Amino acid sequence: GPSFFAINLALAGHEVTAVDVTGEMLAHAKQNAESYGAKAKFVLHRGEFLPFEDNSFDLIVSRNVVWNLEYPEQALSEWARVLAPGGRMVYFDANWYLYLYDDELRAQKKAAEQAFRAKYPVHNYAGNLPKSRILELEQTAYSLPLSKEKRPEWDRAVLERLGMQIIKVIDDIGPGVQDPLDWERDHPIHTFMICAEKPET
């Protein structure tokens, strides 16, 4: 991503390595880091197949990454591999496209959007995309493996299978971190947080 976490962690005094799969985003991230005087190493690579030795990191942080991966379980396995014993992964994600498979959630999402538009008829928000673009995104998301999974239940099961210890799961962090208007529009789709630790032995 644009290095939000990388910048904040680097400015807090941590040694940071940032990974992204696209060169364009990585260049944007570098530019952002430089503008804040934050020092970090930037690596162009896929999150499912990391070019690092075992036990290399004390902390892995990500936001809105796992949902759009082609091999999400492989990614979590890699993250566990490169974590040092006692290290933790903390990530934020959501069931962004579960509504494509879940009729009840789809109805809730539609109702929330209609209520939002009725309340704020002239509000211009980022989610107001052309119908053709929405359909394009939905077609892409439909084939992704996590679009049909209920999360964070899926994540908890996979992490435990990988031998990770679940430290904390927050099913909906939206009200505390999202812009109030964004949350009002999108609240049927919960943004969650997971923290898991690699055991010492």
Give short role names for the model-derived ranges.
Residues E73-P85:
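A short glycine-rich, Lys/Arg-flanked "PGG" loop and its adjoining helix->strand segment in the class I
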Residues R88-S132:
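Conserved class I S-adenosyl-L-methionine
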Residues D58-P72, N95:
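A short SAM/SAH-binding and catalytic strip from SAM-dependent methyltransferases
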Residues L162-Q165, D179-T201:
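Core SAM-dependent methyltransferase catalytic element
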Residues P145-I170:
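Short alpha-helix
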Residues H45-L59:
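A short acidic, Gly/Pro-enriched loop at the edge of an enzyme's catalytic core
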Residues G1-F49:
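Class I SAM-dependent methyltransferase SAM/SAH-binding core
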Residues E15, K39, R88, Q165-I166:
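Residues at the starts of beta-strands that form the adenosine-phosphate
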